Every structure is written in structure tokens, then in C-alpha cells.
């Protein structure tokens, strides 16, 4: 998978800034296959792992009927895979009984101006905010409060996906020792990577002012993180 890698001084070298921007890209579905994939026209704005939504027009209005993620790019075209749109998975909102079809509009890089932020300490948190002034970062206390309520001091992909859905965020930013990444919050594909410096100290499970993120005996998958970097690196493993 193609990634954008930037080498930065200090931890992030934010004195000269760190640019990251993937503009929203709209294009119609050209063809839809029986295996749950479809073809669209490619664009430099989209990367493998970029996600978005499918819009279907009902008379004068349009509605989201599915999620999509980019799975391949070749010869001026890109293949996308359909998924259930998370925000529609509510018992009071029936799922639309409409399958994506040719002519429906795909909106990729959806909500890519909003991101969760996972960093090991307050100083790095403040650096990141200063480096990406055009990114709307969801305050880590919101994620911390969710994990505290769920007794999950070891957040998983699904935990972050839920928080992205609840916060209307399309990205997750994670700072680790030696590298930091922006990734799609649903596919967890790394979209941009920064080579960074050494982390001097860690707050677990990440920097937040919520202090009571603890375990509970009846949750077998709940345990404290011993190694911050190993835990978050695992989230981005291809087979995870």
C-alpha cells in the first residue's frame, strides 16, 4: 500500500508545520459487481484504505445507503468495497433496503477534516494541535470517558470505530515512539506516516484527563496496557 512518509525533526518538527489534507472526492459508481465491490474513476485525492459513503437520490433528496472503502487502484480506475454504514445501525432507524447501483454517488475521504487523537503525553498533544490547525481533533477526554464507562483500558479497533461514528470523525491520529500516523478510522489503513522522535514518557492508555479507566472482573477482554507502542502498532497490522 502506498503511504506518504514525512521525516520531521525533534518529535514532530512542528516549527515548520506538518501538512496533511485529503479533500473530499465525489464521483458516480460506474459499475457494481455481485461480490460487493464497484468501480469508480480514480483520483490523486484518494488512497487505498480511504473510506466514504454512497449517496442515493430519492426524488429531490439524497440519503446515505452504504459505506465504501478503496481496496485497489489501477489504470485510472479504483475499486471500492461496500460496507454497512455504522450510523445506520440503530434499532430505531431501519436500514434502507436499497443496494448501491450504477449512478449512485460515492463520497470518499468522508469526514476527513475530523480526527480522534491518541498521544502518549500532554506535551505531544499540544504539539499536534499546533501542527494541524485545520484539523478538528476530537478531545481525548471524550474517548477516555467512553473507555472508563466500558471498563476498557485497552482500546481496540472497534472501540475507536464506535467513537469515530459517535463523534462524526473519519480519521484517527496516533503518535508512537519513532513514528506517528493518520489512519482511516474504519479500515485502519495508514494514509500518512511521519517519522518522529523518541517519546520521553507515557500516560496509559493515552493522554486524557480522565483518570479512572480501569478493568472489571466480568469483562475478560479488559486489561491494562503494559506497552503503549506495541498496543497501538498492533492496531495497524494488516491481519488484525
Predicted regions and their residues:
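Surface-exposed, polar/charged interaction patches used for macromolecular assembly or partner binding
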Residues: 17-240
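Sec-dependent N-terminal signal peptides
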Residues: 4-14
Amino acid at each position: 500500500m502506498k503511504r506518504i512518509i514525512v521525516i520531521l525533526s525533534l518529535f514532530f518538527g512542528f516549527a515548520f508545520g506538518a501538512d496533511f489534507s485529503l479533500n473530499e472526492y465525489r464521483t458516480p459508481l460506474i459499475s457494481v459487481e455481485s461480490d460487493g465491490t464497484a468501480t469508480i474513476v480514480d483520483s490523486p485525492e484518494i488512497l487505498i484504505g480511504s473510506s466514504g459513503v454512497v449517496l442515493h437520490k430519492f426524488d429531490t433528496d439524497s440519503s446515505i445507503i452504504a459505506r465504501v472503502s478503496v481496496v485497489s487502484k489501477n489504470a485510472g480506475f479504483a475499486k471500492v468495497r461496500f460496507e454497512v454504514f455504522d450510523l445506520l445501525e440503530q434499532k430505531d432507524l431501519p436500514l434502507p433496503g436499497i443496494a448501491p447501483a450504477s449512478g449512485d454517488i460515492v463520497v470518499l475521504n468522508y469526514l476527513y477534516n475530523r480526527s480522534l487523537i491518541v498521544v502518549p503525553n500532554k506535551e505531544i498533544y499540544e504539539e499536534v494541535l499546533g501542527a494541524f490547525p485545520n484539523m478538528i481533533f476530537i478531545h481525548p477526554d471524550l474517548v477516555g470517558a467512553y473507555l472508563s464507562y466500558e471498563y476498557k483500558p485497552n482500546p481496540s479497533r472497534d472501540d475507536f470505530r464506535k467513537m469515530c461514528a459517535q463523534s462524526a470523525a473519519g480519521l484517527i491520529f496516533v503518535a508512537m515512539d519513532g513514528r506517528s500516523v493518520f489512519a482511516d478510522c474504519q479500515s485502519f489503513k495508514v494514509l500518512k506516516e511521519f517519522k518522529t522522535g523518541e517519546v520521553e514518557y507515557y500516560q496509559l492508555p493515552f493522554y486524557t484527563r480522565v483518570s479512572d479507566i480501569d478493568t472489571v472482573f466480568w469483562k475478560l477482554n479488559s486489561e491494562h496496557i503494559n506497552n503503549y507502542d506495541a498496543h497501538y502498532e498492533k492496531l495497524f497490522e494488516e491481519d488484525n
